[in-house]
Swiss-Prot record:
It comes from Acetivibrio thermocellus (strain ATCC 27405 / DSM 1237 / JCM 9322 / NBRC 103400 / NCIMB 10682 / NRRL B-4536 / VPI 7372) (Clostridium thermocellum). Pfam families: GIDA, GIDA_C_1st, SAM_GIDA_C. This is tRNA uridine 5-carboxymethylaminomethyl modification enzyme MnmG. The keyword Flavoprotein applies. It comes from the Bacteria.
């Protein structure tokens, strides 16, 4: 029997990484919010790898934090190992990655949700989106649970992860299920289809979890964390804690032989899996087939937490049967006597075609319905959380009658992510990578606060105290850059001895300290030896000063490119344009433009199938329209 159980401004369906950020953002912006989870013990669950961050993903976490989100703070509280990846490369691709204690992460995030003002946390399966339809225009009015409870709401955010019609595949066995042995959400997909929303079918997978006591670590390479810990959250200046090690081992020809001989029994190759899997996180059988010339593949053995013997085998995701999993794992050095605690499996699930969304993450054809995370065809906790905070902010802004927050490609990786999926769509689980960002030298993880904290403050998620500290940091950076550029270094014996020691050419006449800093073999901290008036500054400030001066030429060039990009982004396109009526546009361009309804000429130019010639026609049309109006 149906009954009215409550009324809210925002209802968030799902409490994974997208749902948590969405619910917290909306509630913190002062709107009455409820978040639903199929099981409250699965809030902020990590059904796959027990880590936060990584290449490009670390950028997303720092951007979420700079806007006022929770993921970075929670990772800082619960990590057990921290590392900067790509440190041998340039600063554009430095990426922070932390191994976290999976259960501690969940407990901390659950507690954060439970204590949040304006937020109720409820265990229930949502089976239907309730909506009104007037003259073909749909508007959400709430959600219904499996027990018939109706919750009225002005906005609904779907953050359903991999639960929609979830199907687990292990070899030739398949059954209806969600991740980690939880129930799937089988009815909500039908509700979305009835609303006319286009769904797709994707697949992802996870490796086995094995017992630490059955591993011989002496046959593996130890992978310790970094000595100096860089926090995810800009609110944390320094963290000191004991870290645990991960371990590296490799597959071999025997492992690959067993996999090849059993390919017909894999869900992926045996035909049981219909969904499209992630290109950049392939299963081990996929890797063995696609990279047949490779003699070995890396396997990282990672702890799931401090109070468990479970270890995660990164690189060994598979849908092979249980008996084959045991056989192949026992060919790997250090895993000869391994005991599997949880089998590897593949999971298939429904998601929406994200080209149905506006850049605000609201569906174009359903007023008040937002989506975030894996339901939008993305993969990864960080990608989900990034969409979650934007959906939560924009849900609250919609209720307050404010314009949505839209970050563009020159402002944030979050902007690149959302623009990519909304404008281009995706035919496989989308993963964030540094190569997707055209302006990656400007979108570094170290300057996420300089880029986005003023926006977070303006939106209302950054406190006065935090913003005051941020402005002080910005002042110190600007002041020190100016000092370094003005400081003269004379060609003294001490200076030239220092330069020789660091394999740098001695100077014959006075130079600015900034000129020495631009030399590739010298860095800001090293130069302290000959920089007598240097102030005592935090690592975060020193890093900004160093990068800003060392890469100044490249940064200026990229800023000029951004100016060109902005010109097309500022040419807005009305929603009511009928592209069929614009003479000169090719048929494919008309069809794509009418379907996606881009918000600017810049966005239109990135749609697959819209050529530079089509953009020229569009610009001429806009000029004609402008003249007619004036």
């Amino acid at each position: 029997m149906e009954f009215l159980a409550g009324e809210y401004d925002v209802a968030v369906v799902g409490a994974g990484h997208a749902g948590c950020e969405a619910a917290l953002a909306a509630a913190r912006l002062g709107v009455k919010t409820v978040v639903f989870a199929i099981n409250l013990d699965s809030i902020a669950n990590m059904p796959c790898n027990p880590n936060i961050g990584g290449t490009a993903k670390g950028h997303l976490v720092r951007e979420i934090d700079a806007l006022g989100g929770e993921m970075g703070k929670n990772a800082d509280k619960t990590f057990i190992q921290s590392k900067i990846l790509n440190s041998a490369k340039g600063p554009a691709v430095y990426s922070l990655r932390a191994q976290v204690d999976r259960r501690s992460y969940q407990i901390e995030m659950k507690n954060t949700l439970e204590k949040q003002e304006n937020l109720d946390v409820k265990q229930a399966e949502i089976v239907e989106i309730l909506y009104d339809e007037v003259e073909g225009k749909k508007t959400v009015r709430g959600v219904k649970t499996h027990t018939g409870a109706i919750y009225k709401s002005k906005v609904v955010i779907l953050a359903t992860g991999t639960y929609l019609k979830g199907k687990i595949i292990i070899g030739d066995v398949s059954y209806s299920g969600g991740p980690d042995g939880l129930f799937p959400a089988n009815k909500l997909s039908d509700s979305l289809r009835e609303m006319g929303i286009e769904l797709m079918r994707f697949k992802t997978g996870t490796p086995a979890r094995v017992n630490r006591r059955s591993i011989d670590f002496s046959k593996m390479e130890e992978q310790p964390g970094d000595e100096r810990i860089v926090p995810f959250s800009f609110e944390n200046e320094e963290i000191k804690k004991e870290q645990v090690s991960c371990y590296l081992t490799y597959t071999n020809s025997e492992t690959h032989r067993i996999i090849r001989e059993n390919l017909h029994r894999s869900g992926l190759f045996g035909g049981l899996i219909e969904g499209i899997g992630p290109r950049y996180c392939p299963s081990i059988e996929d890797k063995v087939v696609r990279f047949s010339d490779k003699e070995s593949h890396q396997v990282f053995v990672e702890p799931m937490g401090l109070n468990t013997q479970e270890m995660y085998l990164q690189g060994m995701s598979t849908s092979l049967p249980e008996d084959v999993q045991i056989e192949m794992l026992r060919t790997i050095p250090g895993l000869e006597n391994v005991s599997i605690m949880r089998n590897a499996y593949a999971i298939e699930y429904d998601c929406i075609n994200p080209t149905q969304l506006k850049l605000s993450l609201e569906l174009r054809d359903v007023e008040g319905l937002f989506t975030a995370g894996q339901i939008n065809g993305t993969s990864g906790y960080e990608e989900a959380a990034a969409q979650g905070i934007i959906a939560g902010i924009n849900a609250a802004r919609k209720i307050k009658g404010l314009e949505p927050l839209i970050l563009d490609r020159s402002q944030a990786y979050i902007g690149v992510l959302i623009d990519d999926i909304v404008t281009k769509g995706t035919n496989e689980p989308y993963r964030m990578m540094t190569s997707r960002a055209e302006y990656r030298l400007l979108l570094r993880q170290d300057n996420a606060d300089l880029r986005l904290t003023p926006i977070g403050y303006e939106v209302g998620l950054i406190s006065e105290e935090r913003y005051r500290k941020f402005e002080e940091k910005r002042r110190l950076i600007e002041q020190e850059i100016e000092r370094v550029k003005k400081t003269n270094i004379a060609p003294t014996e001490k200076v030239n001895e220092f330069l020789k020691k660091h394999n740098s050419t001695p100077i014959k006449s006075g130079v600015k300290l900034a000129d020495l800093l631009r030399r590739p073999e010298l860095d800001y901290d090293t130069l302290a030896e000959i920089d007598e008036n240097r102030p005592d500054l935090s690592f975060a400030v020193r890093e900004q000063v160093s990068i800003s001066i060392k890469y100044e030429g490249y940064i200026k060039r990229q800023m000029q490119q951004v100016e060109q990009f902005k010109k097309l982004e500022e040419r807005k396109l009305d929603k009511d344009i009928n592209y069929d009526e614009i003479k000169g546009l090719r048929l494919e361009a008309r069809q794509k433009l009418n379907k996606i309804k881009p918000e600017s000429v810049g966005q239109a130019s990135r749609i697959s199938g819209v050529s530079p010639a089509d953009i020229s026609v569009l610009l001429v049309y806009l000029e004609q329209r402008k003249r007619q109006k004036s």
